Protein backbone atom coordinates (compact mmCIF):
# COMPACT_ATOMS: atom_id res chain seq x y z
CA UNK A 1 0.00 0.00 0.00
CA UNK A 2 1.18 3.49 -0.84
CA UNK A 3 1.55 6.22 1.77
CA UNK A 4 -0.58 9.09 0.50
CA UNK A 5 0.08 12.78 1.22
CA UNK A 6 -2.21 15.67 0.31
CA UNK A 7 -0.41 19.03 0.21
CA UNK A 8 -2.58 22.15 0.39
CA UNK A 9 -2.11 25.89 0.74
CA UNK A 10 -3.24 29.31 -0.39
CA UNK A 11 -2.71 30.11 -4.07
CA UNK A 12 0.74 31.54 -4.80
CA UNK A 13 2.13 30.31 -1.49
CA UNK A 14 4.84 28.15 -3.12
CA UNK A 15 2.89 24.93 -2.78
CA UNK A 16 4.04 23.28 -6.01
CA UNK A 17 7.69 24.21 -5.48
CA UNK A 18 7.49 22.81 -1.96
CA UNK A 19 5.72 19.65 -3.16
CA UNK A 20 8.33 18.99 -5.85
CA UNK A 21 11.18 19.40 -3.37
CA UNK A 22 9.48 17.11 -0.85
CA UNK A 23 9.04 14.52 -3.62
CA UNK A 24 12.73 14.89 -4.53
CA UNK A 25 13.84 14.47 -0.92
CA UNK A 26 11.67 11.36 -0.56
CA UNK A 27 12.98 9.85 -3.81
CA UNK A 28 16.61 10.48 -2.90
CA UNK A 29 15.98 8.61 0.36
CA UNK A 30 14.90 5.57 -1.64
CA UNK A 31 11.12 5.98 -1.98
CA UNK A 32 9.32 5.41 -5.28
CA UNK A 33 7.24 8.57 -5.62
CA UNK A 34 4.28 9.68 -7.73
CA UNK A 35 3.39 13.37 -7.64
CA UNK A 36 -0.12 14.24 -8.83
CA UNK A 37 -0.75 17.86 -9.75
CA UNK A 38 -4.34 18.83 -8.95
CA UNK A 39 -4.50 22.33 -10.41
CA UNK A 40 -5.87 23.35 -13.84
CA UNK A 41 -2.60 25.32 -14.36
CA UNK A 42 -0.91 21.88 -14.60
CA UNK A 43 2.53 23.14 -13.56
CA UNK A 44 3.03 21.08 -10.40
CA UNK A 45 5.46 18.60 -11.95
CA UNK A 46 7.40 21.20 -13.97
CA UNK A 47 10.39 21.18 -11.55
CA UNK A 48 10.48 17.37 -11.76
CA UNK A 49 10.04 16.78 -15.50
CA UNK A 50 11.31 20.15 -16.75
CA UNK A 51 8.25 20.67 -18.94
CA UNK A 52 4.50 21.12 -18.88
CA UNK A 53 3.38 17.54 -19.40
CA UNK A 54 0.19 16.33 -21.01
CA UNK A 55 -2.74 16.30 -18.58
CA UNK A 56 -5.17 13.49 -17.90
CA UNK A 57 -7.94 15.59 -19.44
CA UNK A 58 -5.92 16.13 -22.62
CA UNK A 59 -5.12 12.42 -22.87
CA UNK A 60 -8.78 11.49 -22.36
CA UNK A 61 -9.88 13.98 -25.02
CA UNK A 62 -7.54 12.31 -27.52
CA UNK A 63 -9.36 8.97 -27.06
CA UNK A 64 -12.85 10.49 -26.82
CA UNK A 65 -12.89 9.73 -23.06
CA UNK A 66 -12.55 5.96 -23.48
CA UNK A 67 -10.48 5.15 -20.37
CA UNK A 68 -9.63 1.66 -21.58
CA UNK A 69 -7.63 3.03 -24.51
CA UNK A 70 -5.08 4.75 -22.28
CA UNK A 71 -1.95 3.23 -20.76
CA UNK A 72 0.19 4.61 -17.89
CA UNK A 73 2.71 5.91 -20.45
CA UNK A 74 0.02 8.22 -21.87
CA UNK A 75 -0.41 10.17 -18.63
CA UNK A 76 2.69 9.58 -16.47
CA UNK A 77 6.10 11.19 -17.07
CA UNK A 78 9.26 10.14 -15.23
CA UNK A 79 11.64 12.88 -14.17
CA UNK A 80 14.27 13.76 -11.59
CA UNK A 81 15.39 10.89 -9.30
CA UNK A 82 12.91 8.54 -10.97
CA UNK A 83 9.89 10.48 -9.69
CA UNK A 84 6.73 9.88 -11.70
CA UNK A 85 4.55 12.90 -12.39
CA UNK A 86 0.91 13.17 -13.39
CA UNK A 87 -1.12 16.32 -14.06
CA UNK A 88 -4.87 16.02 -13.65
CA UNK A 89 -5.49 19.22 -15.58
CA UNK A 90 -8.94 20.75 -15.75
CA UNK A 91 -11.65 22.23 -17.95
CA UNK A 92 -11.18 25.48 -19.91
CA UNK A 93 -11.09 28.61 -17.76
CA UNK A 94 -14.58 29.66 -16.69
CA UNK A 95 -16.24 26.29 -17.26
CA UNK A 96 -16.65 22.94 -15.53
CA UNK A 97 -15.27 21.66 -12.24
CA UNK A 98 -11.53 21.25 -11.84
CA UNK A 99 -11.94 19.18 -8.71
CA UNK A 100 -13.94 16.51 -10.56
CA UNK A 101 -10.86 15.69 -12.63
CA UNK A 102 -8.88 14.75 -9.52
CA UNK A 103 -11.18 11.85 -8.71
CA UNK A 104 -11.18 10.77 -12.35
CA UNK A 105 -7.36 10.68 -12.35
CA UNK A 106 -7.24 8.42 -9.30
CA UNK A 107 -9.88 6.13 -10.81
CA UNK A 108 -7.84 5.90 -14.01
CA UNK A 109 -4.65 4.97 -12.11
CA UNK A 110 -6.55 2.32 -10.16
CA UNK A 111 -8.01 0.86 -13.36
CA UNK A 112 -4.48 0.67 -14.79
CA UNK A 113 -3.27 -1.16 -11.68
CA UNK A 114 -0.48 1.32 -10.92
CA UNK A 115 -1.93 3.31 -8.03
CA UNK A 116 -0.50 0.98 -5.37
CA UNK A 117 2.94 0.42 -6.89
CA UNK A 118 4.42 3.52 -5.25
CA UNK A 119 5.88 3.98 -1.79
CA UNK A 120 4.54 7.54 -1.62
CA UNK A 121 1.85 9.33 -3.61
CA UNK A 122 1.83 13.10 -3.17
CA UNK A 123 -1.19 15.16 -4.22
CA UNK A 124 -0.34 18.83 -4.85
CA UNK A 125 -3.73 20.49 -4.52
CA UNK A 126 -5.10 23.92 -5.32
CA UNK A 127 -6.85 25.03 -2.15
CA UNK A 128 -7.62 28.41 -0.64
CA UNK A 129 -11.15 27.48 0.43
CA UNK A 130 -11.58 23.79 -0.25
CA UNK A 131 -14.64 22.88 -2.32
CA UNK A 132 -15.91 19.31 -2.48
CA UNK A 133 -13.98 18.55 -5.67
CA UNK A 134 -10.58 19.78 -4.55
CA UNK A 135 -11.03 18.15 -1.16
CA UNK A 136 -11.21 14.74 -2.90
CA UNK A 137 -7.51 13.90 -2.24
CA UNK A 138 -8.31 13.96 1.48
CA UNK A 139 -10.48 10.89 0.85
CA UNK A 140 -7.36 8.94 -0.13
CA UNK A 141 -4.72 10.59 2.05
CA UNK A 142 -3.06 9.20 5.15
CA UNK A 143 -1.71 12.64 5.98
CA UNK A 144 -2.38 16.22 4.94
CA UNK A 145 0.30 18.91 4.93
CA UNK A 146 -0.48 22.63 4.84
CA UNK A 147 1.92 25.14 3.29
CA UNK A 148 1.65 28.60 4.86
CA UNK A 149 3.47 31.89 5.31
CA UNK A 150 3.57 34.14 8.35
CA UNK A 151 0.66 36.42 7.41
CA UNK A 152 -3.06 36.68 8.09
CA UNK A 153 -4.40 35.66 4.65
CA UNK A 154 -2.28 32.52 4.65
CA UNK A 155 -3.30 31.63 8.20
CA UNK A 156 -6.98 32.22 7.39
CA UNK A 157 -6.67 29.83 4.41
CA UNK A 158 -4.81 27.31 6.59
CA UNK A 159 -7.63 27.45 9.12
CA UNK A 160 -10.18 26.74 6.40
CA UNK A 161 -8.08 23.77 5.32
CA UNK A 162 -8.07 22.54 8.93
CA UNK A 163 -11.87 22.65 8.79
CA UNK A 164 -11.86 20.46 5.68
CA UNK A 165 -9.41 17.98 7.25
CA UNK A 166 -11.46 17.80 10.45
CA UNK A 167 -14.63 17.22 8.41
CA UNK A 168 -13.03 14.48 6.28
CA UNK A 169 -11.49 12.75 9.32
CA UNK A 170 -14.99 11.77 10.46
CA UNK A 171 -15.30 9.32 7.56
CA UNK A 172 -11.73 8.88 6.34
CA UNK A 173 -8.33 8.11 7.89
CA UNK A 174 -6.69 11.45 7.05
CA UNK A 175 -4.86 13.41 9.76
CA UNK A 176 -2.83 16.61 9.65
CA UNK A 177 0.92 15.95 9.76
CA UNK A 178 1.64 19.63 10.27
CA UNK A 179 2.30 23.00 8.68
CA UNK A 180 5.30 23.85 6.52
CA UNK A 181 6.31 27.45 7.15
CA UNK A 182 7.38 28.78 3.75
CA UNK A 183 9.38 31.89 2.81
CA UNK A 184 10.50 32.39 6.40
CA UNK A 185 12.14 35.79 6.81
CA UNK A 186 13.30 36.83 10.26
CA UNK A 187 14.42 40.30 9.14
CA UNK A 188 11.15 41.52 7.58
CA UNK A 189 8.44 38.88 7.89
CA UNK A 190 8.46 38.18 11.61
CA UNK A 191 9.90 34.70 11.17
CA UNK A 192 7.20 32.22 12.23
CA UNK A 193 5.76 34.05 15.23
CA UNK A 194 2.15 34.01 14.00
CA UNK A 195 2.37 30.51 12.54
CA UNK A 196 3.75 29.16 15.83
CA UNK A 197 0.74 30.56 17.67
CA UNK A 198 -1.72 29.31 15.05
CA UNK A 199 -0.26 25.78 15.08
CA UNK A 200 -0.55 25.62 18.86
CA UNK A 201 -4.12 26.95 18.73
CA UNK A 202 -5.36 24.29 16.28
CA UNK A 203 -3.39 21.42 17.82
CA UNK A 204 -0.68 20.80 15.25
CA UNK A 205 3.00 21.68 14.73
CA UNK A 206 5.40 23.24 12.25
CA UNK A 207 6.88 20.39 10.22
CA UNK A 208 9.71 22.54 8.90
CA UNK A 209 10.74 26.12 8.18
CA UNK A 210 11.71 26.88 4.57
CA UNK A 211 13.77 30.08 4.28
CA UNK A 212 12.96 32.98 2.00
CA UNK A 213 15.85 32.52 -0.43
CA UNK A 214 16.63 33.58 -3.98
CA UNK A 215 17.97 30.10 -4.79
CA UNK A 216 14.52 28.54 -4.33
CA UNK A 217 12.97 31.04 -6.76
CA UNK A 218 15.88 30.51 -9.16
CA UNK A 219 15.37 26.73 -9.18
CA UNK A 220 11.68 27.11 -9.99
CA UNK A 221 12.42 29.28 -13.02
CA UNK A 222 15.07 26.79 -14.12
CA UNK A 223 12.48 23.99 -14.09
CA UNK A 224 14.43 22.05 -11.46
CA UNK A 225 14.11 20.92 -7.90
CA UNK A 226 16.65 22.37 -5.48
CA UNK A 227 18.26 18.94 -5.35
CA UNK A 228 19.12 19.22 -9.07
CA UNK A 229 20.84 22.59 -8.74
CA UNK A 230 24.62 23.06 -8.87
CA UNK A 231 25.92 21.59 -5.59
CA UNK A 232 28.35 24.52 -5.35
CA UNK A 233 25.54 27.07 -5.05
CA UNK A 234 26.06 29.15 -1.89
CA UNK A 235 23.72 28.25 0.99
CA UNK A 236 22.24 25.29 -0.92
CA UNK A 237 22.52 23.04 2.15
CA UNK A 238 20.49 25.52 4.20
CA UNK A 239 17.72 25.49 1.57
CA UNK A 240 17.70 21.68 1.26
CA UNK A 241 17.58 20.98 5.00
CA UNK A 242 13.85 21.58 5.62
CA UNK A 243 12.78 19.31 2.74
CA UNK A 244 15.01 16.52 4.02
CA UNK A 245 13.56 17.07 7.48
CA UNK A 246 10.01 16.69 6.14
CA UNK A 247 10.95 13.54 4.20
CA UNK A 248 12.53 11.96 7.28
CA UNK A 249 9.38 12.59 9.29
CA UNK A 250 7.07 11.26 6.56
CA UNK A 251 9.16 8.10 6.14
CA UNK A 252 9.43 7.46 9.87
CA UNK A 253 7.72 4.39 11.29
CA UNK A 254 4.83 6.41 12.71
CA UNK A 255 4.72 10.08 11.69
CA UNK A 256 3.28 12.45 14.28
CA UNK A 257 -0.18 13.60 13.18
CA UNK A 258 -3.50 14.71 14.61
CA UNK A 259 -6.99 15.86 13.72
CA UNK A 260 -6.88 19.68 13.88
CA UNK A 261 -9.24 21.82 15.94
CA UNK A 262 -9.91 24.80 13.66
CA UNK A 263 -10.90 28.26 14.84
CA UNK A 264 -14.29 29.69 13.83
CA UNK A 265 -14.23 32.02 10.81
CA UNK A 266 -15.31 35.09 12.77
CA UNK A 267 -13.34 34.16 15.86
CA UNK A 268 -10.08 33.95 13.94
CA UNK A 269 -10.29 37.65 13.03
CA UNK A 270 -10.34 38.54 16.72
CA UNK A 271 -7.71 36.01 17.77
CA UNK A 272 -5.14 36.59 15.03
CA UNK A 273 -5.57 40.35 15.31
CA UNK A 274 -4.11 40.16 18.80
CA UNK A 275 -1.04 38.14 17.82
CA UNK A 276 2.28 39.93 17.49
UniProtKB/Swiss-Prot annotation:
SUPFAM superfamilies: P-loop containing nucleoside triphosphate hydrolases. It comes from the Bacteria. CDD domains: Bchl-like (cd02032). Its EC number is 1.3.7.7. GO terms for biological process: light-independent bacteriochlorophyll biosynthetic process; photosynthesis, dark reaction. Transmembrane segments: none annotated. InterPro entries: NifH/chlL_CS, NifH/frxC, P-loop_NTPase, Protochlorophyllide_ATP-bd. ATP binds at residues 12-17, 41, 182-183. Binds 1 [4Fe-4S] cluster per dimer. Mg(2+) binds at residue 16. The keyword Glycosyltransferase does not apply. It is an enzyme of class 1 (oxidoreductase). Keywords: 4Fe-4S, ATP-binding, Bacteriochlorophyll biosynthesis, Chlorophyll biosynthesis, Iron, Iron-sulfur, Magnesium, Metal-binding, Nucleotide-binding, Oxidoreductase, Photosynthesis. GO terms for molecular function: 4 iron, 4 sulfur cluster binding; ATP binding; metal ion binding; oxidoreductase activity, acting on iron-sulfur proteins as donors; oxidoreductase activity, acting on the CH-CH group of donors, iron-sulfur protein as acceptor. Its cofactor is [4Fe-4S] cluster. It catalyses: chlorophyllide a + oxidized 2[4Fe-4S]-[ferredoxin] + 2 ADP + 2 phosphate = protochlorophyllide a + reduced 2[4Fe-4S]-[ferredoxin] + 2 ATP + 2 H2O. Pathway: Porphyrin-containing compound metabolism; bacteriochlorophyll biosynthesis (light-independent). [4Fe-4S] cluster binds at residues 97, 131. Gene3D superfamilies: P-loop containing nucleotide triphosphate hydrolases (3.40.50.300). Component of the dark-operative protochlorophyllide reductase (DPOR) that uses Mg-ATP and reduced ferredoxin to reduce ring D of protochlorophyllide (Pchlide) to form chlorophyllide a (Chlide). This reaction is light-independent. The L component serves as a unique electron donor to the NB-component of the complex, and binds Mg-ATP. Homodimer. Protochlorophyllide reductase is composed of three subunits; BchL, BchN and BchB. HAMAP family: ChlL_BchL. Belongs to the NifH/BchL/ChlL family. This is Light-independent protochlorophyllide reductase iron-sulfur ATP-binding protein. The gene is bchL.
Amino acid sequence: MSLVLAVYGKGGIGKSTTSANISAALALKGAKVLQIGCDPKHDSTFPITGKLQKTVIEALEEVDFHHEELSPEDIVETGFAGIDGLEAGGPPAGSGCGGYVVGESVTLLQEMGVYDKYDVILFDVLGDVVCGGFSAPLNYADYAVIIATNDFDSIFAANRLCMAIQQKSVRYKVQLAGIVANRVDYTKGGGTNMLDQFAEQVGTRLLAKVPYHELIRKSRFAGKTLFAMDPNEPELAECLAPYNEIADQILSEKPIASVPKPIGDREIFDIVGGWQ
